[in-house]
A protein has these predicted regions:
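Low-complexity, Ser/Thr/Pro/Gly-enriched N-terminal "stalk/linker" regions
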Residues: 1-30, 57-58, 62-73
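C-terminal capping/lid segments that line or modulate ligand- or cofactor-binding pockets
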Residues: 75, 83-102, 202-223, 270-356
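Acidic/His metal-coordination segments adjacent to aromatic residues that form catalytic metal sites
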Residues: 12-21, 74-89, 128-144, 185-196, ...
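Aromatic- and glycine-enriched pocket-lining scaffold segments that form the walls
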Residues: 114-182
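Extended ligand-binding clefts on enzyme/binding-domain cores
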Residues: 29, 65-84, 147-154, 166-276
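Active-site lining segments of carbohydrate-active enzymes
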Residues: 68-138
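Structural helix-adjacent loops and short alpha-helical linkers that scaffold large soluble proteins
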Residues: 41-60, 104-121, 160-177, 218-236, ...
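Membrane helical hairpin/interfacial module
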Residues: 29-89
Length: 356
């Protein structure tokens, strides 16, 4: 876990990766919230662990500074000022994810309540205001309406409405119900549309952001069924589509997933976070695909690299590392995966990931 904690700086910034080529040495609001979600998982197991407490304190302090800028600013420099270059803005999943994490800290941490509420109210106000507006997706490429963004927004609004610690007069059941209706715009019969543009044109097929979104809301979206047949079928379709285009899948007998079908970034290779999201879903969803041998192959593939550098992508033919290494988001999703595993003989593997 040294690589994971090295990316969480004492200043409170959480870098996406130490890589400078391409340059991921920034604090993304989205990525940092996802990372903090896994830190909270570790903290709940060891509530007296000073390292986890310090990380939490630093994160709260840093986000209190970040909210002085535009709420949907996607990434920050390490001096805690926004990155001002050309980028996909706004990214409305960031405030919702940060709000979800701060709500969780409000429940389990017991300190910095005033600062946490300051962040929550900032993100809640923005989420309500922008609920029906288009934005860029979590892959930072397409402008429109996105299922992932709407899942985390709905989760955030629900949790705020039903929290006895959050009293916000502009939030009511009508807004939460509207948020749920907007989720429904991404489903038509057996079809799931992860993203569509402002003209209603479908932007993506076989998008792993759907599985990541389910994980990031803990598979709990009020009355929304995270384990419906159409979501399971969507996941099965992704396995089939990516196995057809990635030779490495058949070579290693591992169902690697990419970000989405026809991805062009670094030639569209398998992504570690996408594949982990599939296995997370496998462990929590009743009667869904799970192949024990394939899962062991996946763990072996990760552990063959004793330094656990965990690159963002792997080459679709050779399995070699592609793009940045030591992607913080990778380690975070692994911690979440191991949280979901039950009755599986990998205690030694879990210990390796969650201890130094």
């Amino acid at each position: 876990m040294e690589n994971f904690f090295n990316n969480i700086l004492e200043t409170g910034s959480i870098i996406a990766s130490p890589s400078k080529d391409p340059d991921y040495n920034f604090h993304w609001v989205r990525d940092s919230a996802i990372v903090m979600k896994s830190v909270i998982t570790l903290f709940e197991k060891e509530r007296k662990n000073q390292k986890y407490m310090k990380i939490i304190e630093n994160y709260i302090k840093t986000e209190c500074e970040h909210i002085n800028f535009h709420p949907a600013e996607p990434k920050f420099l390490l001096d805690k000022t926004p990155y001002l270059g050309d980028w996909g803005r706004p990214q409305n999943d960031g405030p919702a994810l940060r709000g979800i994490v701060c709500l969780k800290l409000l429940k389990v941490y017991g300190r910095k309540q005033k600062d946490l509420l300051k962040i929550i109210f900032n993100d809640l106000s923005y989420t309500i205001e922008q609920l029906e507006e288009p934005c860029f997706d979590l892959w930072e490429e397409e402008y429109g309406y996105h299922l992932y963004t709407r899942m985390v927004q709905y989760k955030f609004l629900c949790e705020c409405l039903y929290s006895d610690k959050v009293q916000y007069e502009d939030l009511n059941e009508r807004i939460v119900n509207r948020s749920r209706e907007l989720l429904g715009h991404h489903f038509s019969g057996d079809n799931i549309y992860s993203s569509y543009d402002i003209h209603g044109q479908i932007l993506r097929e076989c998008d792993s952001s759907v599985l990541l979104g389910l994980s990031h809301v803990d598979y709990k979206l009020d009355e929304f069924d995270c384990f419906s047949d159409n979501i399971k079928n969507y996941a099965y379709k992704m396995i089939s589509v990516f196995t057809d285009i990635y030779p490495i899948n058949k070579k290693l007998n591992i169902p690697f997933l990419g970000r989405y079908f026809n991805d062009k970034y670094f030639d569209g290779n398998p992504w570690i976070i996408s594949t982990i999201a599939l296995y997370q879903y496998s462990f929590v969803c009743p009667n869904f695909y799970y192949n024990k041998n394939e899962f062991k192959n996946f763990l072996k593939f990760l552990y063959d690299d004793k330094k656990l550098l965990l690159s963002e992508q792997i080459h679709r033919e050779t399995g070699e590392d592609v793009s940045v290494e030591k992607l913080t988001w990778n380690y975070s999703e692994l911690i979440t995966l191991f949280k979901f595993i039950k009755n599986f003989q990998i205690d030694n593997l879990i210990d390796l990931f969650v201890t130094e």
